[in-house]
């Protein structure tokens, strides 16, 4: 079952390399995955569910990679480390994920389907960095990091260097602007 779901997710990501998200049909994804359509529809009703599951898979991989990494006492360093691990995991899917982000701009309904998944990822990153997200200051930290994450991902899409040097520099600057805030209110 898990293998089939990953196959379907990867099929969608492969199609996204050359096709706009809104033009992709479920039967095309299922055909690419080479699974029987009856079996496939047991897993996913629509392509939005596939995307959500894909991003949950990325979250799980990120969480597993961080098990062996000892977090420092510096919040900024932790956020930087976790973010860059996520970027490394997403790297093979960069063009496809960019296509999804571009589609969100033009398809508000897609945003409505994916926003919970996005905020779940932000919450996970903050939790992994031991940043409290309790009300009221916690919500502010949450929103600030969501903006940093989203804007840095946008920069990453335009960073074609092998080691994501430009992205790392931008992330470091943006986290640096809020470093004191994250530490003081934690």
Residue ranges of model-derived segments:
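Short, amphipathic alpha-helical segments that act as regulatory/interfacial helices
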Residues: 150-153, 157
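Hydrophobic/aromatic residues within well-ordered alpha-helical segments
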Residues: 54, 58, 62, 82, ...
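Helix-turn-helix
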Residues: 15-53
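Generic hydrophobic, amphipathic alpha-helix propensity
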Residues: 3-12, 29, 54-58, 62
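Amphipathic alpha-helical interaction segments
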Residues: 28, 81, 99, 140-148, ...
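Hydrophobic alpha-helical connector segments
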Residues: 53, 67-95, 99
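Amphipathic alpha-helical packing segments from all-alpha helical-bundle domains
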Residues: 108-131, 139-150, 179
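C-terminal peripheral helix-coil segments that are non-catalytic and often amphipathic
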Residues: 127, 158-186
């Amino acid at each position: 079952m898990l293998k089939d779901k990953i196959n379907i997710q990867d099929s969608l990501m492969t199609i996204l390399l050359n096709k706009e998200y809104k033009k992709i049909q479920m039967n095309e994804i299922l055909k690419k995955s080479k699974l029987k359509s009856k079996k496939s529809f047991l897993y996913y009703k629509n392509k939005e569910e596939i995307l959500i599951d894909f991003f949950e898979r990325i979250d799980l991989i990120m969480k597993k990679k961080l098990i062996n990494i000892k977090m420092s006492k510096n919040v900024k360093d932790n956020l930087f480390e976790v973010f860059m691990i996520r970027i490394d995991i997403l790297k093979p899917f960069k063009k496809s994920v960019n296509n999804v982000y571009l589609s969100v701009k033009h398809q508000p309904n897609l945003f409505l389907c994916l926003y919970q998944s996005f905020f779940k990822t932000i919450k996970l990153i903050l939790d992994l960095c031991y940043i409290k997200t309790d009300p009221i200051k916690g919500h502010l930290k949450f929103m600030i990091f969501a903006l940093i994450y989203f804007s840095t991902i946008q920069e990453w899409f335009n960073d074609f260097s092998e080691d994501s040097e430009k992205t790392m520099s931008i992330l470091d600057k943006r986290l640096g602007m809020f470093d004191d805030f994250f530490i003081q209110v934690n």
